[in-house]
């Protein structure tokens, strides 16, 4: 298995410096990761540095709480794409989902999908650690209905990360034609392979180099 091509090499910490981002970009070039996943402020730099390399530029929208307005999320998406993003990972309105306001949740995702149409993949972060299984299923169903390309477990900034059980449930819910991304707490090759076996088609990690080299000692969390 070419695990590198399934990994979004991630650095999203608030104190990330340009030097940190450049290191992630160089590692992505060297190990040929699927993408670098960075905060919006770094998109332009990453797009310039990765031009001509087979590495996508992924950024985050409404991150990490998902509590921005729909209009803000749509604007963030357009702005990120204009600066060179080719993938966007958006956070759903978790509170609206818990309130049973499925219409708002779906519209929120739909507007981001429309803003990205034909220009960037949309991955929908449902923040599994805050949801019941029934809510996880609903979040996945609404994501598919709204036209998302992927559903994703976690921001890495809440109370928990990806589990194989959640990945299996999400895969079962979305079917074979929508991607499932495991993120949050994936630090070893064994972790990554467990997620893929459960149904993940992409893995978000900051310990990506350690995962590829199968080196548990090198694993750190940059979420």
Swiss-Prot record:
Protein name as annotated: Deoxyribose-phosphate aldolase
Pathway listed: Carbohydrate degradation; 2-deoxy-D-ribose 1-phosphate degradation; D-glyceraldehyde 3-phosphate and acetaldehyde from 2-deoxy-alpha-D-ribose 1-phosphate: step 2/2
Catalytic reaction annotation: 2-deoxy-D-ribose 5-phosphate = D-glyceraldehyde 3-phosphate + acetaldehyde
A single BP term in Gene Ontology: 2-deoxyribose 1-phosphate catabolic process
Family: Belongs to the DeoC/FbaB aldolase family. DeoC type 1 subfamily.
Location(s), subcellular: Cytoplasm
Enzyme Commission numbers on file: 4.1.2.4
Classification via InterPro entries: Aldolase_TIM, DeoC, DeoC/FbaB/LacD_aldolase, DeoC_typeI
Main location per the UniProt record: cytoplasm
Keywords annotated in UniProt: Cytoplasm, Lyase, Schiff base
Keyword Lyase: yes
Superkingdom to which the source organism belongs: Bacteria
Function: Catalyzes a reversible aldol reaction between acetaldehyde and D-glyceraldehyde 3-phosphate to generate 2-deoxy-D-ribose 5-phosphate.
A molecular function GO annotation: deoxyribose-phosphate aldolase activity
Entry annotation: catalytic residues: 89, 152, 181
GO CC terms of this entry: cytoplasm
């Amino acid at each position: 298995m070419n695990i590198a091509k399934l990994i979004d090499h991630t650095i999203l910490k608030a104190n990330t410096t340009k030097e940190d981002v450049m290191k992630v970009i160089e590692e992505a070039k060297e190990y040929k990761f699927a993408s670098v996943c960075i905060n919006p402020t770094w998109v332009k730099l990453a797009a310039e540095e990765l031009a001509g390399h087979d590495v996508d530029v992924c950024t985050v929208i409404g991150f990490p709480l998902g509590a921005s307005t729909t209009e803000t999320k749509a604007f963030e998406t357009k702005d990120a794409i204009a600066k060179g993003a080719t993938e966007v990972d958006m956070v759903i309105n978790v509170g609206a989902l818990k309130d049973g306001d499925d219409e708002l949740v779906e519209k929120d995702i739909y507007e981001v999908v429309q803003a990205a149409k034909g220009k960037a993949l949309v991955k929908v972060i449902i923040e599994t650690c805050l949801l019941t299984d029934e809510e996880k299923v609903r979040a996945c169903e609404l994501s598919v209905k709204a036209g998302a390309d992927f559903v994703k477990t976690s921001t890495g900034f809440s109370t928990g990360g990806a589990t194989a059980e959640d990945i299996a449930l999400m895969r079962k819910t979305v079917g074979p034609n929508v991607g499932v991304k495991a993120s949050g707490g994936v630090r070893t090759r064994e972790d990554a392979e467990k997620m893929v076996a459960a149904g993940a088609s992409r893995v978000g990690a900051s310990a990506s180099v350690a995962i590829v080299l199968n080196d548990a000692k090198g694993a750190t969390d940059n979420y």
